[in-house]
Every structure is written in structure tokens, then in C-alpha cells.
Amino acid sequence: KTEIGRVPLHRLEGIVCFSYPGASPALMGKCASLGVDLSFFSPQGRFLARAVGEERGNVLLRQTQYRIADSEAESCLYARNFILGKVYNARWVLERATRDHPQRVPVEQLKRTSAQLAAALPLIEQCDDLDQLRGLEGEAAQRYFDCFDSLILQQHDDFSFAGRSRRPPLDNTNALLSFAYSLLASDCTAALQS
């Protein structure tokens, strides 16, 4: 095999392995001792496993996490804040596209969608039911993804977007989205365990 480069292991937060390349027990042990997450994904980008070292302490954190998971009111608080962040960030992407590329994007459509997302924010803030929150999140995501194709400004023929699909993703854009969500899920899992 050709060496592409070298990076000191202690400078990494994580290593992501694709297409079953494997990792030696020595590498896995060193990653575990340094707290470097080692994640494995299939050739299609599906999450397979994470190799982590011994969890040290954090009993109080774990107890708090279980308590929150058992309480619908507290779970709702966290879910609401995550969803508010997602919708706020979706609006930011749309507004930035209209500001930075007014000649290349359908400004009116993006502004209209941004306004719809803005109108959803107070509904999300006031919602105290997890199922209703999921519904509001789904509606916001649908609105965002309805105009997502117009945000793709480079290599549009290769990365056009007709709608969200997963398990399996049916096109290049959905494959990239699923891959990014897999990486995000791996990072979130690592954060919850630390």
C-alpha cells in the first residue's frame, strides 16, 4: 500500500474507516487509550460500529441522561432546542443563498420558505408534546428540502435533488446527506458518552 501521509494520533479526535479496510488490534488499543474514536462504515456509507475505550466515571452524567430520557417534559425541552437549532440553521442557509447568489437562486421561493420557517419557530418554542414536535420538525424539513435542489450550485447534473430518500439513498445527493448524518450520529454518540 502507498503511504498517503502521517498524522500524530494524539492530534486526532476520530478516525473513520470505509470499505472494510480493518484496523489492527494495536491501532484500536492505542486509539482507545488516547480517546480517539474509531468508526467503521460500509462501502455505501452505512454506520457499522464504533470502537471505544473504557468509559471512565461519569456515573452522574449517565444517571442524568436516563432521568431526562424517562421524563417527557425534560426530553421535550431538549428536543425543542435541537429542533429550534435545525430550523434556525435552515433559515440561515436559505437567507445566505439569497444574499450571496441572488442571480443563481430563486430568491422569491427561498425567501418564502424562509418566512414559513420563521413562522414555525414560535410554534416550536411553545410546543410541549414530543409527537407534535416531531410533526413540526417534519414539516420544516419538508419545506427546506422542497427548495434544496436550487441550493446546489456546482456540479448540478451530478448532484441534482428531487427529494429525500434513504435506506438506501437513491441518488448521489441523498447518499452524501445520509453519509453526513451517519458521521453526525457517530459524533453525537461519542459526545453523549464522554
Language-model features and meaning:
Residues 1-8:
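N- or domain-start disorder-to-order transition segments that initiate the globular core
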Residues 17, 30-37, 182, 190-194:
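Short, intrinsically disordered, mixed-charge
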Residues 3, 47, 157:
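Glycine-rich, flexible loop/turn motifs
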Residues 13-19, 172-174:
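Conserved interaction-surface patches within small, structured recognition/assembly domains
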Residues 6, 60-194:
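Active-site helix-to-loop segments that bind/position phosphate- or nucleotide-bearing substrates
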Residues 11, 19-92:
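A surface-exposed, charged beta-strand/loop segment in the N-terminal or early-internal portion
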